[in-house]
Amino acid sequence: MQIKLKNIGIIKDSMISLDGLTVITGKNNSGKTTVGKVIYSLFDAVANIQRKARSDKCYYVERQLEDLDSILEFFRYFRILMREEENNIFANYPAIQWWLSGEYRRELSLETMEISVHKFIDELMELDTAFLANYMYSSKRYVRISKLGSSIDNLKDTLEEQKEKAISLLQKVIVDINKDPELIDYARESINQTLKVEFSNQIQPVKAPNCKSEIELSDTDTVYFHCGIENNNVINDGTPIFMSSPCKNVYFIDDPFILDDVGFRRFYRGSIAEGETFFNANRISSHNTKLKAILRSQKKLSVFEQNVLGDALKEMQRKIDTILPGTFEFSPEGNYYVQGETKLKISNLATGSKMFSIIKMLLNIGEINSTTMLILDEPEAHLHPMWQNAFAEIMVLLVKELNVNILLTTHSPNFMLALDAYMRKYHIAEKTNFYQTDSIENGFVQYTCVNDDMGKIYQDFLQYLSEVKMLRNSYIGEIEE
């Protein structure tokens, strides 16, 4: 498959192949990471999209039901009666009781919640507000009734008005959650918000904010994603921008220190921060937040899954175990790397070990397989050349043995050479592509494929090595004199 970027970040107009191992080299601040951010945003935005949509819709319904408190204001009186276990006048209205008791907050199924809302509407329509008014008025327990005057009719009219407003809101809720059955708008907005999070709201070139920007991911005759961008937002012209996704999950690894903050936490439904609403960008997680959540999940592969994945997975695990043989333990007492009888706090683990740790943990919980896109930004940064070689071999083997798609950036000549060497050793040249970022006019950059001219990459590295070598030699000469 190929991804085409036009006026995204500082990338002018480039196409990159993603058919196994894709390596991007170039100077600092040359847009190497841009394509990774885009690919992550596209794949993550639509991963498990049906489940995400149901979850969002459940959350939306829950918030609307909470808002009914301010509409059905006088129903607070009946909630008090229910708590005091007095005569429940809603005994024959189970859906109203479902709302009054707050039981809807424990509802996990969108289908069940929708059925309950329908029943709630029906019961409100049947509800005799005159009877309620008489009941409330005669009990003389509701202090605010006195403010309505002495007429029961005033109370009945108020209850009737509140009931009609509630019915109207609930009917709108039903319409809203049944809109967009193909999730065309949902996918567009999810992609839009994920791009905005990953690019900090600067998807388009800062120097040319009014230019036309495009993203397209395709493969031969299939277009997976195609979207235009204006004013740092995905254009909404009613056209679907997402057709299907070639990857089930995606991980973007650019910070080994996230292991220090993985933690052991319990999450409860309904714990989303106050003020968040349907399609709120605050509910779109950054790639690091998502990765931490996956790593702390501590799920394990079943025996069946291990058997299906077979020898290839075991070989990957053996390779990593030669570098990092221990296991990981996350608990309320702390997070540890455990090797034999020794327990080392993960925060004290060598930085280079943390990059291997992340890959090992993802493999162990079954999150790296043939449906995975793995994006790594300068993974060699904290690795000794010996471990750079080992890491490069593992990356190549993930592509060869598990058919993982990997996109990585580097500016290390040793790591680049290691990837080049292992790519040839394990015969995956046809699944490997090398790119270099080249500066063009007006501060823009383009990706250039250098598969047929690998010397260009090494020449770039060698230039700066030669410069400091000559500088060093000049001072050695001065010292000898």
Name each region found by the language model.
Residues M1-I49, N335-K469, I476-G477:
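Switch/communication elements of ASCE P-loop NTPase nucleotide-binding domains
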Residues A45-T371, T448-E481:
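Phosphate-coordinating catalytic segments in nucleotide- and nucleic-acid-processing enzymes
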